[in-house]
């Protein structure tokens, strides 16, 4: 169990054998049956979970990524929860930004971790292109599949899942990269403004 400001996240192994099982699934505390947030790591097929991606994904989903972000959600007086879970620009965008931040500040334990971070960034960039072109009917599912495998380092299974996501939630993949770019732009602006005082 990882902990951030008394808001722990439990990392669980799962062995999901569904048709398109996610390798990593993050469940904030509000969506989890457990008293903590849960990060499920699917160990059913280890060939789909390369070690060079694992460290980058732990930054994206754990601390300082999406768990850190969703742990700061506020609960109102009527117990209603302000949730950012369905704002991919904010959640996934922040997660991708933290993976990049870890790369910029040399927090990866090996060059393979950095490689995994770059590959995931490329994957989301490829998904952005597919998301836009699929939903403008400029690309067939078959063409999208080939593109994601060649340009996004996707397995056939993860590419099918990305295509399905783009069909069911148009703009979700685009939103994630838009969020990453927005966080990078904000950082650049404050680096310029603060100079040596930027930390």
Where are these regions (language model features)?
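Long, His/Glu/Asp-enriched segments that create or flank divalent metal/ion-associated functional microenvironments
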Residues: 1-199
């Amino acid at each position: 169990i990882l902990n951030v400001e008394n808001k722990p996240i439990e990392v669980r192994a799962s062995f999901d054998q569904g048709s398109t099982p996610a390798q990593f699934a993050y469940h904030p505390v509000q969506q989890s049956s457990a008293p903590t947030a849960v990060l499920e790591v699917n160990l059913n097929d280890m060939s789909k979970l390369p070690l060079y991606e694992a460290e980058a994904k732990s930054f994206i989903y754990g601390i300082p990524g999406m768990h850190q972000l969703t742990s700061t959600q506020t609960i109102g007086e009527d117990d209603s929860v302000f949730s950012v879970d369905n704002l991919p620009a904010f959640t996934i965008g922040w997660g991708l930004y933290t993976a990049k931040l870890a790369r910029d500040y040399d927090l990866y334990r090996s060059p393979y971790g950095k490689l995994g971070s770059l590959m995931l960034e490329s994957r989301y960039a490829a998904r952005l292109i597919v998301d836009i072109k699929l939903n403008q009917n400029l690309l067939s599912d078959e063409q999208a599949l080939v593109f994601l495998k060649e340009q996004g380092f996707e397995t056939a299974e993860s590419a099918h899942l990305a295509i399905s996501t783009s069909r069911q939630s148009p703009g979700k993949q685009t939103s994630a990269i838009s969020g990453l770019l927005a966080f990078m732009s904000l950082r650049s602006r404050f680096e310029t403004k603060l100079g040596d005082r930027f930390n």
